[in-house]
Amino acid sequence: MKWLKQLQSLHTKLVIVYVLLIIIGMQIIGLYFTNNLEKELLDNFKKNITQYAKQLEISIEKVYDEKGSVNAQKDIQNLLSEYANRQEIGEIRFIDKDQIIIATTKQSNRSLINQKANDSSVQKALSLGQSNDHLILKDYGGGKDRVWVYNIPVKVDKKVIGNIYIESKINDVYNQLNNINQIFIVGTAISLLITVILGFFIARTITKPITDMRNQTVEMSRGNYTQRVKIYGNDEIGELALAFNNLSKRVQEAQANTESEKRRLDSVITHMSDGIIATDRRGRIRIVNDMALKMLGMAKEDIIGYYMLSVLSLEDEFKLEEIQENNDSFLLDLNEEEGLIARVNFSTIVQETGFVTGYIAVLHDVTEQQQVERERREFVANVSHELRTPLTSMNSYIEALEEGAWKDEELAPQFLSVTREETERMIRLVNDLLQLSKMDNESDQINKEIIDFNMFINKIINRHEMSTKDTTFIRDIPKKTIFTEFDPDKMTQVFDNVITNAMKYSRGDKRVEFHVKQNPLYNRMTIRIKDNGIGIPINKVDKIFDRFYRVDKARTRKMGGTGLGLAISKEIVEAHNGRIWANSVEGQGTSIFITLPCEVIEDGDWDE
């Protein structure tokens, strides 16, 4: 029904009336023009053929005067052929007074020469001695054409001696008329199109002010006061439009102030680093920013309209009345999956009359702070524990020595030996802690050198092989020299830590394997150090590089470990743009993998 409504509009009605007037005018002009043009073209065509025929008549009369009727046939044939070279001429015949065809220009009709013509128009021209014409349809091989037949009698000494019969194709005239009509139709169509377009614009100048005021009225009813009605004149409609604009402007200014404050508040809430939740006076959530949604791990549609205390899982601990009385902050686990902890502060929205209209909860993410605090406490506890154990042991032995054990020649050396071992263990622990502290503060310098890795790793293996007799070392190292760039002292510490652990935890026929594999495509090499020890449970493999972590604390402490060796090794390897990780099968052994950058340098390359 929308099109019907549009059709009934004042704008459309004006355009339709305007177009109909143009169509009627163009039809009248076109009819008058085509009729007169057709008459003019036909008259010109017939006039040309008539003049042409008269020239031919004069020529034939001369032939008859000179040669007579008996010897004139050949010359008349030549005359007809000469005059028949015009495009519009279909055929010319000369027929004598006895209606015998003397000559013809059409080759296919040469057989009709010396035969009698039975055309009634020819008989009429010969009998009356007057020219005549008529239209016929005739096929010249390309389809039927309109043909204008013209007969003109030839007189010598005022006696009719014959008749000139001319068939002229008049199709070109009608084709020309059709072309002109087509041009006129196209011109009319273009004129109508332009008329419609102009009609819309012209009608628009009349209906636009009324339409604008109608639309403005609708928009104002919807609360939109931004539009303005264009004033086209100083008449009554223009005055009405001016009144509309003044009304819209005043209301818009008041609304703009409100919207500006609202947008400013929304922008602040949206871009805050803290989560914001605002509720109505009943505690139902009405506003929540993106940060709060991220902290809660919820979508906006899953939280709007729900009770704030229920969303924060506090309905059993707090009531809305308590929030008004107590503004203290507290910690809250918001997202257990991500371990997110937030400090929550509540406040109330109160009118000047004291009426509470809503509540606001501010969520501040303190997860990182809590994590740092927890790690600090764990570190202090671990260091305290690691120092307390040897100190307690040393204190016990020193007390025993003070009580007289130093006199016992067997016990005194043992007590002193244990005290020395515990002292050395504490020194190692303190040194490891100092090194870790330097790495954390990035104050531990790394002095890189280009190293022949084959020679480097073999030297370390040889040293450990000479220091023990109960462990077999198996080497799978490429013969081709691999060069790398690292701090030899730091990497020696890494390999010593890994090899020492492999030797400590191997059992039975102790065996430590070394496998070195190079990937030239990525300029990386992988070192695998495998033992046949007790192995590590699969759920604890990733934790062995944590500080102070021990799979078996009693066994590790008994063997003199501090729990920091692999943690230091990881820091050193990563500082060399490398990676270290472990694979283990419990009861079968553990493999430590180390990847480092490397280069394959041919012997001749050093000479460049």
Swiss-Prot record:
| GO terms (BP aspect) | osmosensory signaling via phosphorelay pathway
Q: Where is the Histidine kinase domain?
A: 382-600
Recorded protein name is Sensor protein kinase WalK
**Pfam families found in the cross-reference section:** Cache_WalK (PF23846), HAMP (PF00672), HATPase_c (PF02518), HisKA (PF00512), PAS_9 (PF13426)
Per UniProt, the keywords (alphabetical) are: ATP-binding, Cell membrane, Kinase, Membrane, Metal-binding, Nucleotide-binding, Phosphoprotein, Transferase, Transmembrane, Transmembrane helix, Two-component regulatory system, Zinc
Give residues where Phosphohistidine occurs: 385
Q: Where is the PAS domain?
A: 261-331
